[in-house]
Every structure is written in C-alpha cells, then in structure tokens.
C-alpha cells in the first residue's frame, strides 16, 4: 500500500505534491527548498551555507513529521544552481548534519535554475524509524 504523507511544521507544498510517499517502509521525501516553514513568502536566506542549513532543517521537520530522522536516510539527491562555486561550501554544511561515518549515498547535480531563485534543493530516500 502507498501512503501520501504531509508533515506538520514543515513548509507547505507550493505545488500539487505530498511531503513524502511511503511504501513498504521506504520514504520518498520530496525535495525541500530553503523556504521559511513559518512564512513561505519570506525571502530566502542569503548564500549557499544558510540555504543548505535551511533545506536540511526543513528535511528534518518533514522526516520527524512522518516517523523518521536524518539517521534513517539511505540516499540523498542534491541540486545546485552554481555547482562549481557552491559545491564545497554546501558539502561542509551537509556533512555536519550526519554522524561521522554515517553519510547516505548521494548524487549531486548542477542545474540551470530552481524555484524562487534558490541555490540548493535536496530530496531523500529514507526508512521509517520502526524498521
């Protein structure tokens, strides 16, 4: 059975999608942007470090709201609009959110643009906490 999940406290979706879908213990988490969960119309944070922190904090909110956490993430996909410029700085922030030696598999993709002019977006594949 497939479940369509919304997480309280996470940024509201700005298009027709769920925060995540669940199937047989797997969680497919929609890409999060650096939007303010309290005010999705607020300006985005300045710089890749602040935007990466906001994205990962938003992902933590989504995961907590659907019964998981960052330590249950098995795969991440990162989208960067300025790959060469922002890759190293994004990695420093990204790595700080995971326990040493427990980094999920990951793909990082350079893209020509993201909604609202964001610099970064990240989606995840995770397991539910009870698995």
Model-predicted regions and their roles:
Residues 1-57, 61-74, 80-131:
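N-terminal presequence-like segments and the immediate start of the first folded domain
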């Amino acid at each position: 059975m497939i479940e369509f999940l919304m997480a309280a406290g996470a940024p509201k979706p700005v298009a027709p999608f769920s925060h995540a879908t669940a199937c047989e213990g797997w969680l497919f988490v929609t890409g999060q942007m650096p939007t303010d969960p309290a005010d999705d119309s607020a300006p985005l944070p300045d710089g890749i470090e602040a935007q990466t922190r906001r994205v990962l904090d938003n992902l933590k909110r989504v995961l907590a709201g659907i019964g998981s956490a960052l330590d249950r993430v098995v795969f991440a996909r990162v989208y960067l609009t300025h790959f060469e410029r922002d890759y190293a700085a994004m990695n420093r922030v990204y790595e700080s959110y995971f326990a040493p030696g427990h980094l999920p598999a990951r793909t990082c993709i350079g893209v020509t643009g993201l909604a609202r002019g964001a610099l970064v977006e990240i989606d995840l594949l995770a397991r539910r906490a009870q698995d």
